[in-house]
């Protein structure tokens, strides 16, 4: 029998709910009927009665066991099943009938000592004129007395009085009938309960008394009925009330609830309190507020509590019949019913009350007239106890609702005290009683209020709330907000359940009323009330229900790359921080936006019953992506601005301060790392296969349905070479299998699908398949597959090369080998994408290589189990051989491998291919191919090749340092003739039969627990050239400046695409081959772009996937997983395909000479030197350029899955057919778009296509419009493009619907031959962000800057021009025209092209002259805000990509504070700013994405920072002296008087990653607020003399809470003038020049500033120093520089520099560089020589290369003889030619990159 049946029943109901929900998610409806029946049974009243009866029988058994033998127990059970003992059940005469007189009855077994005058006088005094009762109750031998008491503090000197709260029906006290509710107990066993007895002692007396309990109680006379009575007793209705109207109301519950709320008690009756508008009762129309409920069904509810009535209503089922009455004719008190917990008498107003001192208080009367059914519009709060002013407390006005009666009256103010309502004195009433009085008052309400005459209110109130709600009762915890001592105790220790029921009676009552007040039984209201109880009154809880459906596949396909899945489904972006998940933005027109309920900054608490609060971001986002609709969202909105208050924290945990600007984490809007789901055509195609003895010839896997995450689909994984499926040509990897003969595979598990396929008998099999929808550029290679005829079937056996290897259904996440892939800042941070990313040819291997690389980049571990693969044809007994030398790696070994999770593969067959079979079969093999010499146990000769579908979905990159890599023995069994034709994949291992071998891949990368490796490789001597100087000639600058990058993964934050590349310097590794042993490396990658970084860079190339430890490569210890191979024995692999790389390595001599790059580790702030670089000869340039031109193709778009099919062919006719087919598909793709579709091909000239592009003026729509056409460009010559055309594709790269950044990256990488798809719509002109204008002509000698309308000239020996430039959307037409008109000089900057002969692959075209990321003078591209460091003393523009986290900044200050500036308070280490590494605490933020924060308030700054997009552009100012020394703090003492029971009225916050505790908020009306000296952002240095500078927030909070009386604080405040002066200095040093030439280019600004500051310094110094002999003498400066160190200087000058042929001098010195550490170099020093090499006659670029490649001990000879003044003036004049607009001009984040690339290189 259950211990607590009610609780157990609720738990069972909850379990049933969860079970039903899970079954619904799985689509299982078979158990619905049984579960519903079970559910209804548990909810039925009969079942509740049975449970109650069981409990009563158990209780009776306990009673009977303890009743003496001479007693007879007369008991009964009530209708509900409760145990009731009848009167006279104890026959020994101990129970007496009540006496009606107040004198001592002769029946009493004891008589009070009347002679004791002192005792009597005390009792009389305590009774205060009330009726005195003497009661003697015999405590039973078992069980309790049957009543509970409550202790309430009276207003008389803080004395605590004990009142009877409740008398249990059927108990000893109830049968005695003398003890009543609300009786005040004056004495217990002759002990008076005066001020000498505490309430704990009184309760102990009640509980510990044995035998007879003698009580003296005081009771109000029952005949008192005056409306002004001070009695708080529940008014007892007359025994015979004549009702004016009695009516029977029947309501049929339709599931939405009854729609009314009740209130009341036993004696006053239960009354209808509220009627929900639109609810059932409201629609019925008969029930009215104020109706007394007399009977429900056949149950008389008079005398019941409201909770009992609520239970009766719940048990009624759907039909509720009630007898209600209204308009009593009898005299009923207007005093509202009060709960039993209140005292019986209203104590008189103390002499210190507000009314007594007219000098301090004024009393006034207000008359309010209700409008139709509306509330009065005031919100009240109660305070019980002694306030900090010593005055009596009571009910205060907390807030006034705008538009209400109180609001229009105008006389009532917040903090007014309400003393009477309609003449009824309410002093001493609790909140909910006053609420009832106000609610039950008539149309006209008279209020008597008291207000302090002084301006500074000392009322004990919190700041007013903005919540616009009607007056509503507060929950019991809020009843007495500060000083309540309500202690409720059961005095008799009854049965545990009854005790619990009594102790929680009030809470249950209130909760039941709240539920009924809303829509009863409504899940939304239950959710709301549950969270309201948890969060308290400071939060508004909202429940929203969404039922969204993705309309069709095309819609999801169109947007899936632009928005995260959860954003697409819910229509909100979610930022997460520390377990809180906030809505950061709402998608316009999305589901949540349509609902109109939620706002940004609302916190998401729960979705579909899953609590998100407290969960990590990864858990929350993962759940939101998978949770099925409809969605029930529970959100909360903070109603107050206070934080983790020192006084009264709202939550148990420390609240997050408001000043943490970015609590949140942003979702990468591109969702680069979450992979992308495949989509299939809804059209089902029937493929007929003839099953033979070998099966159908394909393998399958299950895959998450992109449209329903709870379901899976069956997908063709791979085809068996020369199998039935491959020969038919109708089935291809990636096809979705929907049916087999008559069997539908919808929602079928993988195992079931396998069984169905295996069970199909041999013969004709009908397969229903859906082809994948693809958008990739390789669509053109799959035209045969989509054609209606099958006439070309026979070609597939010879042309499909290893298709399945390109099918990875979940895009992977990044390298696992974290130590090697840390982010690192480089010396030249600007990453021009220029020519290093030449687009590649449309080679057939592209798709394969791309997906191989994705496979190499390892998906998350948990995703491995989602892609189990089963080969469904053959049997798998072949794998059961226990021979350890047969390295086929059964499942058990895979499971043992610690770094690789089990894939749960089942191999149902293999196929053995003879070496001399037709090459088509070998070329078409799928999966991982294993060659084993140990095949003899199966009876095959060594020449045979065993092919097996090893289908590991990913190969984690295992560090080469781990020595337990599993290795197989591979022999030279591959026929190399077929290799020339095959498209070599990861799974194919070509080995020369006779010569040296090269292991390109390992079939299964798994690690065993023990050292089970076979000794396969013999040790041989190897030689490694570790110093670059030993092979200088091969290290061209094309390697040194390569920008490809492997993604890094932030621990705990998911995987994130980095902002830019951090490759170390190239190095040479020599590996000597060993006879008959492979090199021991496997490679991955190729031409295809694998990943796009956030700044538009592309990740591509050949990478080392694994190095076998005992192999020749492994023995060198010089190669590791993730290294990028730049060159092999003179063959450039930077743009090589996978097959070309394999051939190059295979054909390399002995030794094999690799040039490789590794990712460097990430320093936090210090920038790193980039790479060593040497110029290469013209022949090398030419050769490399020829190779690159041979391999030019397109960069693929962000990948859709599955990848497209490929068909190798060289037939020109087929190419034409393919193009026609592709064009047809393109037209189909955009058939729904309005306008005329055009497909053209253009040949770029040296200036690009001659197009100017802009976006859509509607920022929510992503479009790319042609706004200008150069009359001399290819587009104008072709004549088919017009202004207003919208670009959809370039070289099959889809631009439609893409962001500006994506489009920019694709445009930049376009090759010379460009295929454009665009649409022409007449309305386009109205949609364009920039008014169209013609682009003036340009020539190689004079390219005018047109704000980005011209192509960037990326010069390589003056030979090639690359790129289509976009017009920044923030530039208006007028600005663009004015810039053209104001150009003073041709901006074909000759110093760029002539000084720096860049290598073909360079992507740092403009940064070679600048090591610090700051502007040299060579090109305006030298400052990249994404990478440039922050120079102290000047305003800097920086960009930070948030990735998967928020910015992670906490700020202080604002125009509404004395600080008058927005200053970074802390940089949180998990945020994007910390990863970026440039922002420090103390930096001032001047602008955020064009929003000027110089004059913004604190809240405005927080809003601006929170509502930032993915890329955040900041203008910051740093003064290193600030916020670091206390000399910058204004230190002053503040003394606050802390009153008893009150706090100081301030909230604090500490740094999580540093020391210091700061004031985050001042509570209105608190001690700190009244003092008026403290502000937000002040630092608490000490408390009562105790140093708090290094204390934690918790420590300071505890000390402040425990402090009493006078609290002495020492406060530190950043000096108000310090930031102003700092900004003035900044403006003097930088802004003044900008005012003189407002168009100064950002790249010149730092140099001009530095030089002019230096000039100013020199001017104020002694003029004699200019000719000082010591300054003019050469100085030798020695610098020690490690490989990872940044030199940290910028130079200017050199032959052919824009300043003229002047000597090279130091233009800037970065504080974090090694040069600055010497403290011997100065800005303006002329560099005479570097390591003994004179610089006379060298060009700027030559000197740059010398410095960049100088490591170790660097000797500089310098002379301080540069004429800085002349150079600074010359720079200032030059900078006016750039006219980029004021630096403070507004701009959009999308335009930041373009704004810095407006001039030619």
UniProtKB/Swiss-Prot annotation:
Subcellular localization(s) per the UniProt record: Cell junction, Tight junction; Apical cell membrane; Cytoplasm, Perinuclear region
UniProt KW keywords: Cell junction, Cell membrane, Cytoplasm, Membrane, Phosphoprotein, Repeat, Tight junction
Keyword Phosphoprotein annotated: yes
Entries under Pfam families matching the protein: L27_2, PDZ
Span of domain L27: 1-65
Sequence segments annotated as region (Disordered): 452-473, 1169-1221, 1332-1360, 1622-1642, 1781-1801
GO biological process: establishment of apical/basal cell polarity; establishment or maintenance of epithelial cell apical/basal polarity; intracellular signal transduction; tight junction assembly
UniProt-recorded name of the protein: InaD-like protein
Species this chain originates from: Homo sapiens (Human)
